[in-house]
Amino acid sequence: MDFFNLLEAAFLGLIEGLTEFIPVSSTGHLLLIGHFLGFESTGKTFEVLIQLGAILAILSVYSAKLARIATDFPRDARTRRFVLGVLVAFLPAAVIGALAHGFIKGVLFETPMLVCIMLIVGGFILLWVDQLNLRPRYHNVMDYPLPICLAIGFIQCLAMIPGVSRSGSTIVGSLLLGADKRSAAEFSFFLAMPTMAGAFAYDLFKSRNILSFNDGALIVVGFIMAFISGVFVVRHLLDYVSRHGFALFGWWRLIVGSAGMAALIIWG
């Protein structure tokens, strides 16, 4: 392990935290970076634990809201309906993700060109949705009806294709189903908690026999960077999309997807 390895670990942790909660596909970015940089020194352990850093980032930022939800849950029907809605939205990904885990990790995650195509397609979709003259019916995540939550949950399953983006699919789905931009992003945050935690736990279980902490310093650096950058994004994203929408992320996807595709064609 040398300074370059530490720098690379910090960079990957930064990318995980910055891209996990915005609609640009953290998995797509990490797969492309891994393909072109060949970062394999920490393997599965590094991949799993930097994701934990992002999970803890959103839990820390939303700790006060989560505590309030827990306090209100026994006596407030609206809060109970909201929690049920998040769980209902989580179920499709939990079931389909468990059933298709081998195919997703073994086939889809080994196809960098697919990542680039999905980044580009998703970029065009974000730009299109951002320009639509939508009239939102839901301005607060607490008011999402259960059928809407279930529909968002099925739409989230599209993000099992690397490059689609979990947050991107849920945000676009929420917007098209009647949510305003701020609540769409916030519901994506709440849905991220069980979805990411479930994916983390499942990956940890499936990889339990190959996990290694030999490169502990790299794991710690990546974890810390994912946590810090994740906290920054979660704190500022809602205000940003309320004022500016999602066009920036659409262009971001188009640029990264096109650059990745060109690099794959030229260098493979």
From Swiss-Prot:
GO terms for cellular component: plasma membrane. It catalyses: di-trans,octa-cis-undecaprenyl diphosphate + H2O = di-trans,octa-cis-undecaprenyl phosphate + phosphate + H(+). Coiled coil: none annotated. It is found in: Cell inner membrane. It is an enzyme of class 3 (hydrolase). Keywords: Antibiotic resistance, Cell inner membrane, Cell membrane, Cell shape, Cell wall biogenesis/degradation, Hydrolase, Membrane, Peptidoglycan synthesis, Transmembrane, Transmembrane helix. GO terms for molecular function: undecaprenyl-diphosphatase activity. Its main location: membrane. One of its GO terms (biological process) is peptidoglycan biosynthetic process. Its EC number is 3.6.1.27. It comes from the Bacteria. Belongs to the UppP family. Bacitracin is thought to be involved in the inhibition of peptidoglycan synthesis by sequestering undecaprenyl diphosphate, thereby reducing the pool of lipid carrier available. This is Undecaprenyl-diphosphatase. It comes from Brucella canis (strain ATCC 23365 / NCTC 10854 / RM-666). The gene is uppP.
